[in-house]
Amino acid sequence: NSRDRRPYIRPVARVELSEKDVKKRTVLAIVFLAIAVIAIGYGLFSLINTQPGWVEVTGSSREPNVSSDVKLMYDFSRSGGSATAENKQLSLIYTQACRDAHVVFSPDEPTGGIAALTAAPGEAVKVDPALWEAFRLLEEHGDRTVYLAPVYTEYARVFRSEGDGEAMVYDPAHSEEAAQLVRELASYCADPEHIRVEVLEDDSLRLVLSEEYRAYAAEYGLETLLDFGWMRGAFVVDLIADRLLENGFTKGYLISFDGFARYLGPGEEPFTVNVYHKRGNDLYRPAQVAFEGPMAWVRLRTYPAEVRDREHSYVYADGTAVSAHIDPADGMNRTGAEDLLVLGERC
C-alpha cells in the first residue's frame, strides 16, 4: 500500500530449537569451563608450590640488594611434600642475606660500613663482622686493591664508552693525560701513609687519611675512597653462602655474574662445570671439571663473556681488552693472562 508509511520489516523465520541440542551445548560448556578452571588452578598451584628438583631461588626485597648479581640454585629433590615450605624459608634467608651483602660491601650504600668509615676518618667505627673480616684478610695479605676506588671511577668511563674513539680518550693505555691522572691517584692509593684502614678489636675499623690526601680528595671531589672493585663478588658470595650454611641449607650453589661461585655441599650427583677459554674473538670449552663439593670456584677474565661484563670491561675493535684488574703501583690495567681459574674452600 503506497499510503502505508510504516518501515518495511523482513519476515522472521521461526526455528524450533531442539531441547536435546541445548542440553548437549550446556554440558559441553560446563565441561570446557571445568577444564579451564582446572588448568588455571594447576598453573597457580605450580607457581605457588615448589616441585622437587633443581629450582632457582629468588629474593623478594624492594630495597637495594645484590640478588641481580648472584644466582642461587637449590636442589629440592629430597624435600618431597615439604619443598614449598623449605623454599619459602630459604627465600626469606636469601633475601635478607642479599640485602645485607649490599649494605656491607657497596661503597654507594649510605647506611653501610664503608660509608660510615669514609664519613669519619680517624675514628673507630663498629662494622658488620663480614666487613671486618674482609679488611683483616686484605691486611694479612698486603692487598691494597680496596684503596683504588678513585682509579676505578676513571676506568668506569672507559667501560661506559659507546665506541673506540670515546674509550681512547679515557683509557690510560691510549691517553697520556688519562695515564698521568691514574698514576697520580695511584700514588696516594698505594701508600699506607696516605690511606689505610686499621683493623681493631671488637669488629671495629678505623680509616686513616693523611692531610695531603684529604686536601687532594676535597680539591678534586673524590667521593669514593674505598671500593672492593673486582673482588667484591668474592666477599658477597661468601657472606650469602655463610648465611645459608648457618641455617642448614647445603644442597645448592651460588654464582655471581662476574665469576665467583660457592657449592654449599655434596649434591645427589657430582657437580659438572664447563671451563671456557678465549681463542681470538671466540670462546671454546677445553674441559669440564667434576667435583662433589663443598667448594669455591673463582674464574676471573679480562674480556666480556656475559652481558653484564660490560660493567667492568671494554673490548676494542681489534680485540684488545681493558678490564678492572688494576696494578696499584701505577693505576694501569695489567694482567698476566686473559682468564684464570682457581678452586678453594672460600672465594
Placement of each model-derived feature along the sequence:
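Mature catalytic core of soluble alpha/beta enzymes
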Residues: 1-347
